[in-house]
Each structure stands twice: as structure tokens, then as C-alpha cells.
Amino acid sequence: GYSSAASDVYKRQTSVCIPPAYVKQVKEYVQDKMAVCTVIGFPNGYMTTAAKEFETRDALTNGADEIDMVINISDVKNGDYDKVEQEIIALKAECGNRILKVIVETCYLTEEEKIAMCQAVTNAGADYIKTSTGFGTGGATLGDVKLFREHIGEAVRIKAAGGVSTREDFEAFLDAGCDRIGSSSGVALLTKKA
């Protein structure tokens, strides 16, 4: 059995994010004790919207509770913000009441593009804007989180991922306005003494 400390950590973690191929197996294991999340369009978001819709439906059928989608960075770089927004709308429609997080991969975007993505995510009705996949050239920064907080709608939450590895980082990102932190060091962050 779990010790009380381990049990407390388990309760404080919101979800576990895993590859789509393992959603069904992990959902059967965790059942309703923890939300199961998977990433659609990983890692660069270059597939078509139809492919992302299929991938989303498949993940939800297999038991995913939350979907993280990767935007098509090329569409952003080409200034086709409406196309990005329409894709988010399509995937949110597939998700229904389930949580949709939109990964914008901030390390590749200019400030103008980040602000445009805040607007697209807000307009499309997504639940979260997320900084990064963890596979880009950089992860979350406090500056990006503060920029998001200034430019997203009130209903949109912020998730920082990548680069949050110490208790000090964790607290700084929460103070900057994050609603969730994605970290491969989650258990260690929650169990270390302050």
C-alpha cells in the first residue's frame, strides 16, 4: 500500500500524460483515481486537422479524460492564425466537456505570435493554453506565463511545461499565474521539504 505521504502526492497530481498508444491500458489501471491525458499532433502539429480529429476521437474512445493538442507551428509562422483557431474549434468539438489544452510551443514564437495564439485559444473556447511539448528548444518561462495572463480570456487557464524542476521554479510559476504545472519531476517537487 501507499504511505500517507505518497497517497497525498497521488491525490495532488491532476493527471498523467502518456502516449496515445497506452491510453486504454493506463486508464484501466488508474480508473477514476487520476485523469489520463494524451497529446494529439505530437510533436510538431504538422498533420491535417482531419488526422488530429481522428486521433482525438480514438484517444477519447480509449478512455482519455484530457487532450493536449499541438498547434501547427508552420500555420502560425505563415500568419494563418484563423486556420489555427479553426483547428482548435474542431478539436474542442470532438472533446465536448473534456479538457482541451492547446500547446503553442513558445520557444519558436515571437511575442506577437504568442499574443495571437492567446486570442485564438480564447476565441476557440479551449480550456488551457500550454507553453510547450518538452521537445522544443526551450520550455516554459515566467515571461511567457505573464504574457499569457495578460492576453488570454478569463475562462482560459495556463499550463507551464518544460523547465520546471525545482520547488522554487514550481512556486514562481504558480505566483506568475499558472493554473497547472507539467513536470517529469512532479512527485519529487511535491514531496521535498520546503
Language model features: what each stretch is:
Residues 18-33, 47-51, 74-94, 109-114, ...:
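Active-site-adjacent beta->alpha loops and helix N-cap segments on the catalytic face
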Residues 42, 62-75, 126-138, 163-166, ...:
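Glycine-rich phosphate-binding active-site loops on the catalytic face of alpha/beta enzymes
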Residues 47-56, 109-120, 164-179:
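Catalytic cores of alpha/beta
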Residues 8, 59, 91, 120-121, ...:
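Generic structural signal for hydrophobic
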Residues 26, 59, 102, 129, ...:
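Conserved, mostly hydrophobic/aromatic
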Residues 16-18, 36-40, 67-69, 100-104, ...:
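Hydrophobic faces of well-ordered beta-strands that scaffold small-molecule active sites
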Residues 11, 62, 94-95, 124, ...:
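Structural motif
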Residues 1-6, 10:
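Single conserved hydrophobic/aromatic residue that forms the stacking wall/gate
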